[in-house]
Regions:
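Non-catalytic helical/linker scaffolds that mediate oligomerization, partner binding
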Residues: 1-228
Length: 228
């Protein structure tokens, strides 16, 4: 059995990480959705120090951005009341390819599925599951293929630095096809990560439907329930 913890502000100093190692944590995930790997070298240094202190070793996994879609910056939290109308692009900043993909009746999931909208017309949507939305949260368009590359520029930069920092596992989010994993695996090999484990994260229906095609191309499958 493996046990993972996420590196974060409350879990990033040597003492806390050493305590987690002693309690049986076998791996640490570093979420790169909001920040580059280079900005978290202090956390990684603390983890390696904790490993030396305890004599225990943990897997260090980076969770990439991948083809994930996120909303833009918002000056203030936006309350979304169930039944209310909200406009993507005007009220909620989104990229142009998102606006172009909208179709009436389409479901839009926000913040890993915590909130949901139904497209009425153009960018106008009806809130079907309310909450309070803040900037840079995830956005999923059910049934849409935005054809974004498997790895974004930030992912490529992070993978280029990963081996030198002791990373030995890579998580690819929003896996859609075998092609996605082939791209990620080849990029890992090119950056000295040939022996690192590849975790494939299923976060949408297309990825789930294609699972038989890509299952053999990864080492571990992770199910992200929020957007499913």
């Amino acid at each position: 059995m493996r046990y993972y913890a996420t590196l974060g502000p409350s879990c990033c100093d040597t003492a806390a990480l050493a305590a987690l190692l002693r309690r049986g944590i076998t791996g640490f995930r570093l979420n790169l959705s909001h920040t580059p790997l280079a900005a978290r070298t202090d956390w990684i240094d603390a983890l390696h120090a904790a490993e030396r202190e305890t004599g225990l070793h943990a897997q260090l996994m980076i969770d990439l951005r991948g083809p994930e879609v996120r909303i833009g910056n918002m000056p203030a939290p936006l309350p979304l009341a169930e039944g209310a109308a909200v406009t993507l692009g005007a009220d909620i900043p989104v990229d142009g390819d998102v606006l172009n993909a909208l179709r009436p009746g389409m479901t839009v999931l926000l913040d890993d599925g915590a909130m949901a909208l139904t497209v009425v017309d153009g960018g106008v949507c009806r809130v079907t599951r309310g909450g309070t939305l803040t900037g840079h949260k995830s956005l999923t368009l059910e049934g849409a293929d935005l054809r974004r590359p498997a790895l974004c520029e930030a992912d490529l930069a992070d993978l280029a630095q990963a081996a030198a920092l002791g990373v030995n596992a890579v998580m690819q989010p929003f896996v859609r096809s075998a092609g996605d994993l082939r791209v990620v695996r080849q990029t890992m090999v090119e950056n000295g990560l040939a022996d690192a484990e590849l975790f494939a994260k299923v976060e949408n229906q297309p990825g789930l439907d294609a699972l038989p095609d890509w299952l053999a191309l990864c080492d571990v499958v992770t199910i992200a329930r929020g957007d499913l």
